Each structure stands twice: as C-alpha cells, then as structure tokens.
Amino acid sequence: MAEKYSLTVDSRLERLSEIANFIELAARSSGLNEDQTYDVQMAVDEACANVIEHAYRGRANGTIDIVCEKRGKEFVVTIQDFGERFDPKKVASPRTRDPLSKRNIGGLGLFFMRKMMDKVKFEFSAGSGNRLTMVKKIKK
C-alpha cells in the first residue's frame, strides 16, 4: 500500500516554507535523494506561489490541498485549488535565449516545473477546480 502525505494550507505566501518542509519530509520518506527532493521542492514552490498569486489573486482565504504519494518508482504530487481557472496553453513559452536585459521579469514558473519534474499535467473542472499533478521518477 502506498503511503500518502497530505497538507492543506491557506493561500498566503508565508505558507511556502511550511509547504517546502512538508515536501522534504514526504519526498525523503518516499526514497528520493537530496537532488530529487530539491527539484520537487522547487517545482511545488513555483506551483503554489502561482496559485497564490494568480488563481487566488493574493487573497489569503483560498485553500491549497497538496497530496504526495509514492507509486512504484514514482513520486506523485497533486496540488488542488479552487481559484480562477488556469490554462497552461495560454502561457507563452519563455524566451530563455534572449539576453537578460530583454526578458520580462517572471514567467518562468511553468518552464521550471517542466524542467525539474518528469511529468506535469494540468486539469480543471467546475466542481473540483484546478488540479496539477507532477511526477518525479525515483532514481537510486
């Protein structure tokens, strides 16, 4: 039986450190090494910061549900929110080859999530809001 780790927090930026600690515990307990754990922490931090900033538009009364689970040789993180709908197809790809002086500030969160994780999937339904599922393969 897979071990599940669950955390529910309100949508305040101050919760990001609590989320990072939760992810570290769940990832290390599931067999991820230090580098893999760091990748997951960074991806989840980006995702949750985006939920707070964009889905809830900075409102502190939103809810973020995070579930982590080891499934075979994969570590699966699901992040659920009930904020404004997110459509990743509407996010322009960052121009990472442009000089820094010509780049916009921000806009790299989705790019980083996809680089750090092995799978990234977004879903939305009117009844259950936004659901982000990210997978990291567990390597020894």
What residue spans do the PLM features occupy?
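Conserved beta-strand-loop-beta-strand hairpin that lines the nucleotide-binding pocket
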Residues: 1-6, 52-140
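Helix-loop-beta hinge of the Bergerat
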Residues: 3-34
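Conserved catalytic core of two-component sensor histidine kinases
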Residues: 17, 37, 41, 114
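Short hydrophobic/aromatic-rich motifs at helix boundaries and adjacent loops
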Residues: 20-26, 37-38, 81-83, 92
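Conserved short strand/loop->alpha-helix "switch" segment adjacent to the catalytic nucleotide/phosphoryl-transfer site
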Residues: 23-45, 102-104
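Hydrophobic residues in the alpha-helical elements that line and stabilize the ATP-binding pocket
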Residues: 47, 51
